[in-house]
Amino acid sequence: MQVATRLIQAMLTVAAVLLVESAALAQAIVQTNSAPNPYRAIENWAKLPEGRTWGSTNAVDIDRDGVSVWVAERCGSFAPPSMMKPGLPFACSDSPLPPILKFDASGNLVKSFGAGALVLPHCIHIDGEGNVWVADGLGKDGKSHQVIKFSPDGKVLLTLGKAGIAGNGPDEFNAPSAVLVAPNGDIFVADGHGGNTNARIVKFDKHGKFIKTWGKKGSGPGEMDIPHALAMDSRGRLFLADRGNNRVQIFDQEGNYVDQWFQFSRPSGVFIDKNDIIYVADSESESVAKDHDGWKRGIRVGRVSDGVVTAFIPDPVEKATTTSAAEGVVVDAQGNIYGAEVGPKRLMRYIKQ
């Protein structure tokens, strides 16, 4: 009898734990579309040279001066990775235009470079020394599947990955989506863009020497589906936009799983400022991601400390059939938000009202 009683008590305890976990998860995935929007949109803020038009872009970051904005755009083309067709002109591989652009605080173009060096720029990251890192996505004609480090003036300083060769070895990528450099110089690459590409994070030292990799395709803790963007908080934790799983995953720098957040919708871009405010861009809900209906596209703002969403900037395009709203997001020292958009082909600026 005592054995049976203990067994029943144990089963009830397990059930209670599962119930609490289920309740917590249910609370975490409550839609956060109704948070207030204290921002006003500014279109056409960044000024391109006469005759040049914006291409698709999700690659945007802030210079170490805190106000200048760096962008890697796809050379005037509409070029999401899913549209890549062998043998056809595609993005920057067939363009003489420089894809890496730097704008001052007034939106004036002050620097550009990278012509002929990139195929599909998917992420731009400015490290603590001001160097410019680009994750160059899908390969074409012997190029790409690489991460490239440029000096602030456009000199190639380091290249990771094999040009045009997709793989999952320690010196290979398959459609790298994002790169981030830690304060100590360690390099983290989010490697993969869905389909038959990879689903992992790769870590290198500051010289580009392979350290480790973690993650695989799946939806469990530590697994990934389209690892799309990276950010780091003041505690040194990595935040991954795990887009295919509609969540943000949190890891330590050794790859140990910490947590997962669903309240930031379907994340394409993620940025954390010096005050540990997190900004997450959703460019696909109710358009490309039909399985995420009910969630609204836009930029969600929240706190790293507790994950609470405090503001929501909705997509200026109410109805869309393709990727829309910001796919990349960044914030300057004054708190202005910049959203890089693939579908509408533009860079939006949002200022507090």
Q: What role is predicted for each listed range?
A:
Residues 27-353:
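Eukaryotic scaffold repeat domains enriched in small/polar residues
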Residues 1-7:
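N-terminal secretory signal peptides that target proteins for export/translocation
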Residues 7-10, 28-29:
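Residue-level detector of intrinsically disordered terminal segments
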Residues 9-23:
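Bacterial N-terminal signal peptides
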